Regions:
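Short glycine-rich or small-residue beta-strand-to-loop segments that form or flank ligand, phosphate
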Residues: 1, 43-45, 102, 148-152, ...
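Short, small-residue-biased leader/transition segments that mark boundaries at the very start
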Residues: 3-8
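Active-site rim loops that border cofactor/substrate pockets in soluble metabolic enzymes
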Residues: 12-19, 192-216
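N-terminal glycine-rich phosphate/adenylate-binding segment common to multiple enzyme folds
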Residues: 20-130, 134
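Solvent-exposed alpha-helices and their adjacent loops that cap or buttress functional pockets
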Residues: 33-36, 90-95, 140, 169-170, ...
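Generic secondary-structure signature for well-ordered alpha-helical cores
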Residues: 37-40, 72-79, 104-106, 110, ...
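Internal alpha/beta core interface subdomains
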Residues: 102-172
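Active-site pocket-lining segments that scaffold enzyme catalytic pockets across diverse folds
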Residues: 152-201
Length: 216
């Protein structure tokens, strides 16, 4: 019986700092789009430049993390799973099952806007809708110099994150634990919690019960 196979020609994208600088970081975007097209990629370690690297490599700008750029385009989830090898004993002997960490790959600090505050003044969050109406939220009344950072996320992306976590748990037969600082971040982090719970109740509660795993 002949097996059908699909072959993909190797495509190489140089994400070294020199080439990223030559392409104004377009090569990073191109590599992410290729990953979306072909559904698979292997990425080597890259450098996210700081001020010292900008000077060392004579960069045009302080480019953002290539990992962050790629993950944002893929709207993916980062799963950090242990590699279990016979003969390599776990540091905590009582841990008998693997622990996998899932992290949302879109938005947050990777897509944040930042500003240095030079002197006393007021910092606000401002949202302007398509009709020009504004909503304002005070961040802080500065008495002197400081810093601020603005982060965002998208409900659609959070929903995709939730489904990828639930599906991964079902595929690997692992309990899923949700963790966030919703007691402090009552809107930002709590939105994650609410979306996860809503999707679980509607689409995954019965599947988890059938698989013998739990969502906490």
């Amino acid at each position: 019986r002949r097996q059908r196979q699909m072959c993909i020609r190797d495509r190489y994208y140089d994400l070294g700092l020199v080439h990223r600088n030559e392409t104004n970081d377009q090569v990073t975007v191109d590599s992410a789009e290729a990953t979306k097209k072909y559904g698979v990629a292997v990425k080597c370690a890259t450098i996210t430049p700081n001020a010292a690297r900008v000077k060392e490599y004579d960069l045009k700008e302080m480019y953002k993390s290539p990992n962050g750029t790629i993950r944002a385009i893929l709207d993916g989830t980062v799963f950090r799973a242990p590699i279990i090898v016979k003969g390599v004993e776990p540091y905590v002997k009582t841990w008998k099952k693997p622990i996998t960490i899932a992290r949302h790959a879109y938005g947050d600090v990777y897509k944040a806007s930042e500003m240095k505050i030079p002197a006393a003044g007021k910092a606000e969050l401002v949202y302007t809708d398509e009709q020009g109406n504004e909503s304002r939220e005070l961040i802080h009344n500065f008495k002197g110099a400081g810093i601020i950072q603005g982060m965002h996320n998208l409900n659609d992306s959070i929903e995709n994150f939730a489904r990828s976590c639930f599906n991964f748990a079902l595929e690997t037969k692992q309990d899923l634990w949700f963790a966030t600082k919703d007691t402090i971040s009552k809107k930002y982090d709590h939105t994650f919690k609410d979306i996860f719970q809503d999707i679980y109740d509607k689409d995954y509660a019965d599947k988890f019960k059938e698989a013998g795993i739990e969502y906490f």
